[in-house]
């Protein structure tokens, strides 16, 4: 490095490529690109301006929390300089997958205005003002809205892409692997070249960011190992400030250094792995050099890189929840002031003569003024929409008071609402709801106006805070119509596994975007042969084996789905879903919701469950996933033909989903359809498997066969059971098929293989609460479930742990005996 008064130059030699590094110019010399980075006085002072703005935003943000304007604040102060350097290595089409510390890099890439920064801090529930999360995430969670207002994809190659940040520490890592893996697929699978809005020949790299304490999480280590195995362009920055809130690194990390702890993954001349670089958070020149080098290795060589950014400071501690003076001694606090990256950068500028002290103070003062102005604008706009509602509510309550017997109470409500200096949306709604209580014995035009206002306001707030749990686009899988399976007059009867395999073959033949991955999926075609022979036909790059790492299998799928591919990833057995549950519930299930329709990841998770053998190969934890994975569709096919039809439906839609295939159905014979890949099972529409008049049994999955067999035995004694296969738990019975059946039979039993109160409890709530079916019952509803323990091993263990034919028969008989004891005496 050579220093001059006006310019700082350094050189990097790169292989010839089609991309143009950002933000500097590139020239061609003898088939070699020479990247000539010229940092002018103007560049340097622009960087100084940005770090001053970012720091001031952090300081004012904390002040607003302490002053009551915002509920909570967490900021990126102390990391400004490293993020400036990272931004200079970013190119359009690249991705950032991070957490709540990255405000400076987002601002450097023009993805953040400071007004939007404060709008998010205040919780402004409007995409126009908080385009990142529409007030649904706390502050410092950033999003590139890669979906248009109709939910359709926009180009990802002409923007700097930020995947909506996560607060659960380490949660951003699994999807980072998938985002980087997508670049590998786009680079090596030429059949994807037409998807130019998603990739330019796989030249995109992924910048993941994580705090040093969060590197203790298992998903971080799983991601690092998988990235090194897969050799994907993942550039991970670890912001190391030496603490996890109050817990020092000595309690967190082996050797008190994540770069030392990861040294075994360092690549060598003979062994692939990852590149590990270290740099100080306050060293401007070294940061620039390190990030340019890291990005070059990552982009050109397709090698993962970890940049361990050391000696990061926390000027305000972890968050607004408390002061770091509680757990840092005076020497540490003094060191943090001395090594503050903004202070060091200022001194470096002065030492090298790029500006005078007066010039830097002028920049600092201008930054403070700008941040104050944008913060005040954000607050004013935030309050305006709320105060409009406040005034509307006050006016309507006072109007109602003029003719009401409860006038004093109503006027007090209006006066209390008027005195709210910094009201929230809830305040007007609360006041109107209380007013309507007071008016419950009266009828008037003003009461009707209050009621009308409340209903309109409820719809507005439903959109503000509860929309986009599922797709609202034209591609919603709920809009995919049913297409029946077609058969020969004498169809071939094959194992169920052959039906789903043939269907996957048809799908992969017709859509190059499809990718399947998971343990044993590739070479042997999965443990139940649903992909047998398909890797050989469609290639290893499309049907791929993975290690035993459920969390990053899901992460790979999320990243691929975000980048325009259609992955089907496998959790080998349903019991193993717990390994991946955090990533499923925190990231995948919430992505569309927490961006208010700005981002989606239409991933399909394939697994198999219900009953086979033993504690960990026969689980059916449906309540766990139903209550953890709102935002996904949960499909529970009774056989492999139904499963195939569900895959066909889901691949025509744009929501994520979990499909639980019946584990004991792969070798049962099924008719092979003719229209493979085309027949569709609609979501949320149960199927009546057997007509009856005496009672309705609602079930799904492998239990369908059990219940059907019991129904035949019950018919022999004069009990006719109507059997309904719900087919999907999310969504559940959209057309109220179950209600129609109960109106006929007046009795209902809910049966599944989950533990007591699990899936049966969910179905009971849906039918009794949502469908109000209780009005049609002549007998109390009953449930049939597995025992409260995990299923025991062996056929005997299955029989005494899971519901069986005799259980279904006897509980149904008890129901009939209670109703007609003479006809059905107790057994």
Can you annotate each of these PLM segments?
Residues 4-82, 88-89, 315-317, 321-538, ...:
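Conserved acidic/glycine
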Residues 80-84, 160-431, 533, 663-827, ...:
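Thiamine diphosphate
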Residues 99-100, 176, 209-210, 236-240, ...:
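Short beta-strand segments
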Residues 284-304, 357-359, 579-580, 591-594, ...:
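Phosphate/diphosphate-binding loops
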Residues 599, 609-613, 617, 622, ...:
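Active-site phosphate/pyrophosphate-binding segments
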